[in-house]
């Protein structure tokens, strides 16, 4: 395992691994300046039994509407990236959830975040919700309408 990967676990010791390339891309969107706008996209990767591996993300595009504390993903490129990777992998790489940034050091979901995740993401499989803050990442797993924060696993 690469030391730059992030690993999180749920209450049942199911893992969510964020590959190092994805960690680097997510970190590049941290809102470190007072003029930085919110960024976001889709989380894409592999389902390995009860474990999830995030291997790719879609990134902000010119059609997305972004401001300091809000984001509307309007670009069709987000879905196109999911579709392309799904086809290239013969259905092995799939949509796993959503990510976006917050202009705070230690992020947590807002009421709007939770409402949009519960209402907007309908899936029979567990989905991942991720918020990139200036110093830390908040990550949760959505199963049906229940969202639980995951714990960071220390990797030796």
From Swiss-Prot:
Keywords: Antiviral defense, Hydrolase, Metal-binding, Metalloprotease, Protease, Zinc. Coiled coil: none annotated. Induction: Part of a CBASS operon consisting of capV-dncV-cap2-cap3. It comes from the Bacteria. InterPro entries: CAP3, JAB_dom_prok. Gene3D superfamilies: Cytidine Deaminase, domain 2 (3.40.140.10). Belongs to the peptidase M67B family. Cap3 isopeptidase subfamily. Metalloprotease priming reversal component of a CBASS antivirus system. CBASS (cyclic oligonucleotide-based antiphage signaling system) provides immunity against bacteriophages. The CD-NTase protein (DncV) synthesizes cyclic nucleotides in response to infection; these serve as specific second messenger signals. The signals activate a diverse range of effectors, leading to bacterial cell death and thus abortive phage infection. A type II-A(GA) CBASS system. The sequence of this protein is available as NCBI RefSeq accession WP_024167427.1. This is CD-NTase/cGAS isopeptidase. It comes from Escherichia coli (strain TW11681). The gene is cap3.
């Amino acid at each position: 395992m690469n030391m730059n990967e992030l690993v999180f676990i749920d209450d049942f010791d199911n893992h969510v691994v964020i590959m190092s390339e994805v960690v680097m891309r997510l970190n590049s969107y941290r809102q470190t300046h007072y003029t930085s706008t919110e960024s976001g996209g889709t989380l894409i990767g592999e389902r390995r039994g009860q474990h999830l591996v995030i291997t790719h993300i879609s990134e902000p595009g010119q059609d997305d509407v972004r401001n300091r504390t809000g984001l509307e993903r309007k670009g069709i490129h987000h879905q196109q990236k999911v579709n392309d990777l799904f086809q290239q992998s013969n259905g092995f790489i799939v949509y796993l959830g959503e990510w976006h940034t917050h202009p705070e050091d230690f992020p947590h979901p807002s009421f709007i975040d939770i409402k949009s995740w519960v209402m907007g993401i309908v899936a029979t499989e567990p989905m991942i919700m991720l918020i990139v803050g200036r110093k830390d990442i908040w990550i949760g797993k959505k199963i049906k309408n229940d969202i639980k924060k995951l714990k960071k696993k220390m990797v030796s």
